[in-house]
């Protein structure tokens, strides 16, 4: 399979290039960065593109890829419901290309979200803390947003988090994502980390995942690259590829 990388000179993108080049069943075709022409992907007969760019350009990238029948595996964050609906419209109008967008490709991070969803209904309190390097463009992270939404879905019908806070500084209790408080930390020296804290009478449970190196994303990305042609249209997350129950 012929694979290109958008954002190839970025820290994550360069890691993806190395991962593709190390895979016996994949061929790296070309890397494209800011200022480069996307047509290089067509000229090199690229079949699948890995996109780790920026929220400000990812939609234009996807429109080009879909229009040219190139599959896309996207790790760029900043996808709102409106953006996802737009991608679905493009895919419906141009059958033949598939897109997989995941808030996190680290297998451990995906499993931690799955575990959090399973635990959610057993605890009366839950909060999410995500910690990243200071160059990250969005807050909260896509992983934290998805985690909170999965938890909220699992807690449907349950009372809201107990919280007697009546005064305080704006933002002190974090962002509210479907009723789940989410707190963002940006700190030099970090890569990508998340804690989900659960509490109930007499006990707490913490589910934590740490990506200490960007190579943690490679196995999940390459799994998506190998499976993308089997999943027409838009796929969110790599959970469907992991056979999680």
UniProtKB/Swiss-Prot annotation:
Looking up PROSITE patterns in the UniProt record yields: DAPB
Reaction(s) catalyzed by this protein?
(S)-2,3,4,5-tetrahydrodipicolinate + NAD(+) + H2O = (2S,4S)-4-hydroxy-2,3,4,5-tetrahydrodipicolinate + NADH + H(+); (S)-2,3,4,5-tetrahydrodipicolinate + NADP(+) + H2O = (2S,4S)-4-hydroxy-2,3,4,5-tetrahydrodipicolinate + NADPH + H(+)
**Which species is this UniProt entry from?**
Mycolicibacterium vanbaalenii (strain DSM 7251 / JCM 13017 / BCRC 16820 / KCTC 9966 / NRRL B-24157 / PYR-1) (Mycobacterium vanbaalenii)
Write down what this protein is called.
4-hydroxy-tetrahydrodipicolinate reductase
The positions annotated for binding NAD(+) are 7-12, 75-77, 102-105
According to the UniProt entry, its GO molecular function terms are: 4-hydroxy-tetrahydrodipicolinate reductase; NAD binding; NADP binding; oxidoreductase activity, acting on CH or CH2 groups, NAD or NADP as acceptor
CDD domains attached to this UniProt entry:
DHDPR_N (cd02274)
| Cellular component GO terms held in the UniProt record | cytosol
Q: Which HAMAP family match?
A: DapB
């Amino acid at each position: 399979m012929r694979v290109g990388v958008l954002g190839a000179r970025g820290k994550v993108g360069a890691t993806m290039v190395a991962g593709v080049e190390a895979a016996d069943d994949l061929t790296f075709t070309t890397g494209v960065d800011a200022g480069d022409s996307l047509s290089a992907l067509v000229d090199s007969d690229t079949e699948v593109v890995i996109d780790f760019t920026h929220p400000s350009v990812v939609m234009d990238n996807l429109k080009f890829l879909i229009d040219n029948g190139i599959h896309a595996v996207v790790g760029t964050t900043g996808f709102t419901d409106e953006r996802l609906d737009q991608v679905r419209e493009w895919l419906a109008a141009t059958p033949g290309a598939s897109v997989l967008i995941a808030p996190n490709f680290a297998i451990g991070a995906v499993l931690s979200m799955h575990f959090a969803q399973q635990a959610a209904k057993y605890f009366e309190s839950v909060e999410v803390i995500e910690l990243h390097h200071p160059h990250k463009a969005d807050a909260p992270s896509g992983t934290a947003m998805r985690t909170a939404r999965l938890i909220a879905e699992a807690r449907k019908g349950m009372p809201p988090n107990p919280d007697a806070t009546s005064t305080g500084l704006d933002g002190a209790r974090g962002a509210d994502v479907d009723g789940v408080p989410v707190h963002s930390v940006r700190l030099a020296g970090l890569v990508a980390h998340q804690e989900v804290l659960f509490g109930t009478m007499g006990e707490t449970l913490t589910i934590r995942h740490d990506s200490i190196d960007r190579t943690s994303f490679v196995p999940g990305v390459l799994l998506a690259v190998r499976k993308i042609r089997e999943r027409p249209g838009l796929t969110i997350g790599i959970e469907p590829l992991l056979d999680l129950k």
